[in-house]
Structure formats: structure tokens, C-alpha cells
Amino acid sequence: MFPFQPMYPMQPMPYRNPFAAPRRPWFPRTDPFLAMQVQELTRSMANLTFKQRRDAPPEGPSAKKPKKEASQKQKGGGQGKKKKNQGKKKAKTGPPNPKAQNGNKKKTNKKPGKRQRMVMKLESDKTFPIMLEGKINGYACVVGGKLFRPMHVEGKIDNDVLAALKTKKASKYDLEYADVPQNMRADTFKYTHEKPQGYYSWHHGAVQYENGRFTVPKGVGAKGDSGRPILDNQGRVVAIVLGGVNEGSRTALSVVMWNEKGVTVKYTPENCEQWSLVTTMCLLANVTFPCAQPPICYDRKPAETLAMLSVNVDNPGYDELLEAAVKCPGRKRRSTEELFKEYKLTRPYMARCIRCAVGSCHSPIAIEAVKSDGHDGYVRLQTSSQYGLDSSGNLKGRTMRYDMHGTIKEIPLHQVSLHTSRPCHIVDGHGYFLLARCPAGDSITMEFKKDSVTHSCSVPYEVKFNPVGRELYTHPPEHGVEQACQVYAHDAQNRGAYVEMHLPGSEVDSSLVSLSGSSVTVTPPVGTSALVECECGGTKISETINKTKQFSQCTKKEQCRAYRLQNDKWVYNSDKLPKAAGATLKGKLHVPFLLADGKCTVPLAPEPMITFGFRSVSLKLHPKNPTYLTTRQLADEPHYTHELISEPAVRNFTVTEKGWEFVWGNHPPKRFWAQETAPGNPHGLPHEVITHYYHRYPMSTILGLSICAAIATVSVAASTWLFCRSRVACLTPYRLTPNARIPFCLAVLCCARTARAETTWESLDHLWNNNQQMFWIQLLIPLAALIVVTRLLRCVCCVVPFLVMAGAAAGAYEHATTMPSQAGISYNTIVNRAGYAPLPISITPTKIKLIPTVNLEYVTCHYKTGMDSPAIKCCGSQECTPTYRPDEQCKVFTGVYPFMWGGAYCFCDTENTQVSKAYVMKSDDCLADHAEAYKAHTASVQAFLNITVGEHSIVTTVYVNGETPVNFNGVKLTAGPLSTAWTPFDRKIVQYAGEIYNYDFPEYGAGQPGAFGDIQSRTVSSSDLYANTNLVLQRPKAGAIHVPYTQAPSGFEQWKKDKAPSLKFTAPFGCEIYTNPIRAENCAVGSIPLAFDIPDALFTRVSETPTLSAAECTLNECVYSSDFGGIATVKYSASKSGKCAVHVPSGTATLKEAAVELTEQGSATIHFSTANIHPEFRLQICTSYVTCKGDCHPPKDHIVTHPQYHAQTFTAAVSKTAWTWLTSLLGGSAVIIIIGLVLATIVAMYVLTNQKHN
């Protein structure tokens, strides 16, 4: 690589110590007799350890050569070169290895890896082959005292004891099982349901487990491996292999495994095949044969081989037959040739190109199709020329071959140019397909120059870069983050997509016709046949020739037509080529360069500058590319927004206590929560109180201030009016009678008239004499009151103590509580039992999964329009055959094709007919790019809980259904059912690109053109395709072979453009949406009932725990509505040291600690959260209670990045200071009113008394 040798630094000189080395320490020598005894004991133990039954050694040379052979080799080392050569010859002519003669045994890997060695060692006594006709058809393994064998594997277990067992069938899991004898249970595998993502081991090496799927590299594992176990690092079975399916570069395995309950679960990927050695049979001339062993092959009988492939084109073993037919027995091929062997069955062709250098032409490089659906900027072209093969059909890399008027020529690929708006970079070619990377443009042109002639072809196609993610970038960035995407694979591995082939039709070749003297001579190419049709002097000639022949009846070249016939090569089923007459033999070959899942580097927009305000967030955005901004509220109504930001902008949003989330470009989501904070001081002066509450409760504050102002105004007005009224009343008598004067004391004494009420006896006597019904009613009122009071006393004195005692007694065994269904919020409580210390219980849900039951309705993707080569009949009529393909259309057109390239095609002008057929099929990339339509039903809930009961902790998974218990340390826990049946998924959902959408898709079989579901299939690989694309055939243009049509655009593509943000960004309650399986996690909605059954052993006697004799609680610091923003200090005196549970029975405060350590005398610090401005709660420490109360201040931070885990219940939202100022205000108004009323009363008494006196 470099022109010069690298220079390495010289080794440093060894360090020399100038001082003499110290003497070696002396140790006493051991007794030789004792050493001999130790060696003998070691030798005996080694014999006992290794003298066990061992399997037959693997094939191949041993790890170490025998000493004898090594010594012979050393002796022969000094011999001459001649003897060495003789020794080699003798070795070649020596007796054959008996193991090498046994062709039935599979050659094992000479150097198996560590995983393979471990599995082979564990499989030796626990896995047994199933033999069928002397071959291993599969395997049976013994797991957990049971024998498991795949039900689809036929044969007999190679063990007499196990073969005699009577098995039971479980068709749902494709397994047969039986209990093994007691003496064999010691050698069985153990199984486990624990399957963390990572790598596991099986017979062929490593198995990757990710997203609930087991995968291996492609080519690892094949038929005959059904029944093999997959093991973890501890040698436990995690799954049993049943089959597999190739998915690009990896193979997905069909397995049977176990869930957390120990219940068997089967996972089968789509289009999976069973891995037993059941032979797939194919057909040839009414004779069946194994598809992998055809009686003929292409190199020996090409025409017959194509006919055989056509007969079995729909056979499940077509791929095996195709591979075996191309690879003749006895011929070895290089591994690189495997990629190109299929397309040796085909040849290039010439086809019509709509835009050549000068108008339309029949081009050797006609472009059939262009696809650019990946996210990597690559383009896949399908052309009439071929790549990777030379003109003879042999392998030749970086070469293009093409058809030039019947002659196949080749050209180096670097002489072929491809460009859009600028030149493209050609990556590779395979068969009819070419992979290139092109810049953006509205058309794509391919051209090459040969013998000073330039051949080109252009087609209109908008080539553009398809970005992945939430930023619309135009070029892949140098730095960023990796994101899942779809890219075109740069290899030609078989991926399940096919391109249809058929025998080529007859093509007129004027070069075959020549004039020799006065007669016409037709010369067919060597090894091919030609059909000759002539009209000479009223004589019609039609015959097939394979060698040169003269036709003396004809004297002009225009009187004869020569058609090239070829039945040993296929061509692409193009609408630009005529169809062969009669029954056309068709086939299919694999499409290379398909879309595959990959990782793409996507850019990251600059982080927004965030400014926090009171319950608000301001984002200042500076995108480099158009970037999506999506927000939602983490409440029951998400109120999501979705906006594409192209220019610098500022966006303001409201944040509530329930949370708010925003996603900027390809950055991860960020969440913020508002705190109950506000300016001002709830415990300060009136203006500070008003400012504080105005920001917290603006409407309530305005309403309260308005009421207070109205009361004050009314009070002042009423007092003023009463004062004026009293003044007028006082002055009026004096104005009328100036000399009248009444003493004030007399007026006061005379104003109070005397009155005497009746006694109780007199009232009852009056009722008895005048109204006896009312008498009895009055008499029964005290009796009824006495009965009510008696019942209340009975309830208070009897029922409540009974319930308390019963609850205490039941707490010894059962305890029921309810916790919020919100991940991360810890729930603390205690169990009080008479005679025992309180038992603390702490529960923290780490994850809550909501998994709906889904049913796949259908799969939809891009469609591809298939067009049969037009069937042409000269001078005659045709009819359409019955249609059976999806959305198939057929029409017959007359008066077409009077001419074709190379001379006239038909002798007639208007009597010619063409049958055009077009239909719809799934695109080649449907396997990678498709959407799945599901119907969702009832959801199950799983909660991952971190539970602490006393001093025992466990992390467990609980099914929240109210039925499934979980046992740990003797504690039995039952959770559920959830308090609400809410789910973020609608009845109809769509899964696409790893995201879920609520979408009301059409039912199966009811798709509309141009809408989602225009093509529908039950699965990606199934053949039950429904299509409705408004396909209409148009009349072909005279003189050109093609099938024009019109069609609605892809509904799948339109849905991808118009779809709203997925549930990942719009789900209520902050749900996190995932796939595989479809589920919602950590939805903060509802509550989970919990029921504990606690054994007596976990309780502690009261005598063994401390008892507080004196306790005092002080709030050192208190910030309300903040995450454990309160600090309480409890000073105490205890009977002894120990550990005590702490708890607040009311919902006023939530404690962070579940228990505290106590000494005989000291203080304990406890952190708590509260939403109360003036918290006052009883704190229970062991069996004692202490009251804590004080004032709390609002938090300083308006916005925080974590939810508040404080208590949501509180008793007072208004501070005592505010109430004091309010009562003072109302109290002052009341004093004014009272003074006015007193004055008015005095005046009224005075006036009335004066009038009476007068």
C-alpha cells in the first residue's frame, strides 16, 4: 500500500544492574517418597476422571500426532529431495481411508468453535437422531424429564428405550412429547424462560435473539436440523428448532419456547419451511422425481430443461429444481459463479425505446423499469441487456452483453455510462438488472459507444434522494445517528422475488435472407432454426430449416421472411416483445438487488434553545434542513401538533403538571413537567398573596377579588344609606316640633314591650283540645330522635371496633391496596397487625405493558403491473382467454403491426390482430416495504414490579388480570384487573416501518383504486392477492410492439405521503408504542388493585421492636408540589435500638423512606412530598404516632424534566395568611354594616317611642 517500508523504532538496550543479584532463597527439599505418593494419587484421580464412556471421535485428523509418526518424520528429515517425492507418491497410492469411503456421513467441521464444542458436549447424551431409511431426518431431545420430537419429522428415534415410548401429539405446537423413564431423567436438559437479547448456542454455532426472534447467518442450518435445541451459557434449553426461512443475509428460525408461566409458545416467521429431510417431488413427463435430483440439466439438454422448469414453475420445490438443473452433476463451479448461474438460461434482446438519440428506436439497451425506493440514493434498473456474462454465456465480471440484430456482443461495463442530471456511478450488474448511484434528475439515460456508433436510451423517471427519519436532508451526512432504513442489497442473494421469463417469439431477421443468382437463399445461424415464409407467384411456402436452403420459386428478397427460432433460451416477459406462437413455456428467475433492512446515518438538527416560563416553554429553532417538530400533552387529550420547520423560528407551548413532550427532528423525545410554582408569596402581604394566586388560579382569583370588592362596595353603600336614613329620622321630629324633648332613658325603657310565652304543658293541652293529630306527631318526634341516636351509638360502639379487629386479624394473611398505574412512582404502605410490628410494603412498577390481541387482516404494498408479451396473429382474428390473475385486463385490437424492424412483419395490412393482457402483482420489494393491517381486540396488561415486603425484595412480572398469582418468599401477590379498560389502539390499526397508526382501513376485498388497500394479500408470501387499481388497456400504436395502459397511482404510496404521525408521537397518557409484539408501555392511566397473602414468618412481634416514649416532629424545610421537597426531623426517645416502619396513613404526604433505623435517643430525618400549602399529617413510626405540621413554600423551578411523585390529594389550596387577610377584609365590611344597623335600630326605637308618647 505504501511505497516505502515502515520504519520501526529500535529495541532499547537491556537494562544492566550494576549490583550483584541477590541469592536465591533456600527452601527445604520435600521427601521423595511423599512426592511419589502425591504423583500416584494424582494419576489415580486422572484415571477415575477420564475413564468414562466417550463418543466416537470426530472425523478428520487428531488434534495431536502420535509420537511414533513424529519420530519417523524426524528421522526422514535428513533424506534427499528424491526420497521426499517418493514418499509423497507412496502416500497418494496408499490404502484409502475407510472413513473417507463412507459417503453417507456428513463431513464435520475440523475446527468447531467454542459454542459448537459446548453444544456438542451437552448434546451427547440428551439429543437423539430420528432415522428414516438410514438417514437422519431430524432430532429428538429430552428436556425437563420429557421427550420432545417435532411432529413433522418422520422416522424412529435411534434409542430403543425412547423409541418404545408412547407419545402424545400437540398439533398446535408441531410437537410430540412423552415422559422419559425415571433412570434417564438425570441426563435431561433443563429449560428456562429467561431470554435476554443476545447470542445463544446451538449445534452450528451462535444464534442471535432479538425482538423475540431467533436468527442465524444464511446457510447455517438446513433441512435435517429440526428438533435441535438452542442453549444458553448455562446449558439450559431456551428453544427447540422446527424450521427456518431465509430473510436476506440471515435465516429466521421457527422455534418452540417457554414463557414466564412455563407454558409452551411457538413462534413461526412468515413463509417458513420445516427442516425435516422430507423430499420435495417434481414432475417430468408424468414421472415424479426429487426436485434436488432432476434427470436432466441445462448444459446437456437445454430445451428439455426449460420445458421441465416450466412444468414445475408453481411447485414449492422450484428453487431446488432450478439450482440442480443449472448445476449439472459432476461439474464443479466456483463460488462466485453461483450468483450468475440462473441467468445463463436467458439471453439479451432488443426492444423499443421511447427516446433514443433521435426519436424512438429499437435499442439493445432498452430500459424496462427503474426503481429508487431505498433510503441510500441507489437506483435499480432493468434493461434488455445483461450483466456479468460474456457473449458466450460464461461468467465475466464487470461486463455487459447485448443483442444487436440477432448477434450477441459484449462490452466492458466501464464503457457504459449512466446519467441523470449528472453522471451516475454504476455499482454492479446481475442478469437484466443494474445497480447504480445517481444524482437527482427527472430522467435517466443509458448509453455506450461501439464501433463509432452511440447507442442510448432515455426514460422519464424522477430520481431523487429519499431521506429516512424526520429531517428532509438531500445528501447522507458524515456524522449523525444510525436509524433503521431500507437499502438495496449489493449482492444477488435469493430473497423470494421473481421476474417472469418465457420463450422468445419469432423475430424477423432480414440478414438471414440473401439473393443468390435468381433464387432466394436463407441461411440460419449455426445451431439454431429459422422459420421461412414466402409468397412467390401465388405459391405460399412455410417451413422450418436448420441449414442453408435455396428457394428457386422466389426471385426477390421481399417475397420471403425469415424468423429466428430459439427454444433453448428464455427472455424477459416484456410487453415490447412479441409472444411465441402456441403454448409459451414460461419460467421465473430471482430478482437481485432487492430492498433489505439496514442502518442509515441520519443528521441531527441543532438542539433548540429552550426557555422556561411559568407553565410554558419557548423553543428557538435553527434547522439546517426542513425538520419536523411534533409535540403532545401527556394527558388524556394529547392535543398533538406536527409541523415542518424550514426556517429559524420560535414556538411557544403550554406545559401542565401532567407533562408535555416534544420531538425535534431525529433527536430522542424530551419531556417536561410543570410545577405548582408562581411569583409572589402565599404567606406574605396582600399584594404578594394576590400575585401568587393570580398566576396559579387566575379565574378563581379574579372571581374572589370581584366578590370581595362587591361585598365591600355594598357594605359601604349600605352603611352610608343607613347612616343618612338615621340622620333624617332623628332630625325630622325636631324640625316639626322644636320644643319637644323626650329623655333618652325613658325612650329606651318604653321601647321594650313585655311579653310572656306559654309553658310546655299549656301548649300540649292546647294541641290535645284543638288538634290531636299534631299532638301525636309532636310526641313521636322525641321518640324517633331517641331511636336514631340509639342506632348511631350501636354503630359507633360495636361495628367499628369489630371491623378494626377483623381487619387486623385478616392483615396477618391478606392485605389489599391500590397503586397508581404509572411507571416509576413508588407506592409505600404498611400492614398493621395486632401484637406485631407494622410490616412495610414498597412497590415500584418499572414497566407496564399493554399488549392487545391482534388479528392480521391483510398486507398491502406497492403493486407492479405485469404485462404479457402481446400475442400477434397475422391475417386472422383472436379472442381473449379467461382471466384468473389479480385485476387482469384483456383486449383484442385489430389493424395493427403491418411493419416491424427488419422488414414487414405481416403480409396483411388491416387483418392483423393483437391480444394485450395486463395484470397486477406485488412489487419485487414487497417483502421489505409493506404495511400490515390489523384488527385489535382485548388487551392484556403486564406489570414489571420491584416489590419489597419487610426486608425481602424481588423483581417480578405480574399479569394484571386479577387471577394469576406470583409467589416469592412465601408471599402470594395477585394484581388486577386494571381499573379502566382503556387502550391507545383503535379497533383497526396499521403497522408500517416499526410504527403503529390508528387507521380505518377498508375490509379485505373492498379496496378502492388509489387508496390504502388497493392491493391486499393475507401474508407477504401468500398467493391470494386481491387488486383494484383501475387498470385500463389502451390501443397500441401501429408499427410498435407494446401494451399501453392507464392505471391509478399506488394507494400505498399515497398513504405513506398523507399519513399522520404515528401513535409513538400522538398516544394519550404518554404511552410508548412498540412492535414485535405490538404493545403500549408506561401509560399513566388507571390504577392496579393488589392483594397480598403474607405468611406469619414475615411479621415481627411488638416486643422485639422499639417503642417510642416521646416524639416531636419539626418541618425543617417544605416545598410543596415538588419531588420529596419536604424534610421532617423527628426527635424521639426509644426503648431500644432497632428498625421501624414509617408511614403516613392519610394521603396528605408521601414518604420516601419505608423504614428508619432508631437508636435509644436521637433524631430521624424523613423526606416527604406533599401538595398542601399547610401540611398537617400523622406520622406512624412503629406503633407510635407523631403529628407533623408547618408551612410550605412553592418550588423555585417552573419546569422540571421528571414527573412529580408527590401526593395528589390535599385539604387546602389557600394559605392561612390569605384567609386571614380575606377575613380581615370581610370583617371590616361587617363592622361597618353592624354599626349602621345599630344606629338605624336606635333611631327607629326612638322614633316609634316618640310617636306612641305623642
UniProtKB/Swiss-Prot annotation:
E1 fusion peptide loop: annotated segments: 896-913
Residue ranges of the region described as Necessary for nucleocapsid assembly and virus assembly: 1-33
Disordered: annotated span: 45-119
Residue ranges of the region described as Binding to the viral RNA = 91-127
Residue ranges that the UniProt entry lists as topological domain Extracellular: 276-701, 758-772, 817-1224
List the disulfide bonds in this chain. 861-926, 874-906, 875-908, 880-890, 1071-1083, 1113-1188, 1118-1192, 1140-1182
The entry's stated outcome for residue 50 to A is:
Complete loss of capsid protein nuclear export
This protein's GO cellular component annotations are: host cell cytoplasm; host cell nucleus; host cell plasma membrane; membrane; T=4 icosahedral viral capsid; viral envelope; virion membrane
Q: Which Pfam families match?
A: Alpha_E1_glycop, Alpha_E2_glycop, Alpha_E3_glycop, Peptidase_S3
- Record-given protein name: Structural polyprotein
Q: What is the lineage of its organism?
A: Viruses, Riboviria, Orthornavirae, Kitrinoviricota, Alsuviricetes
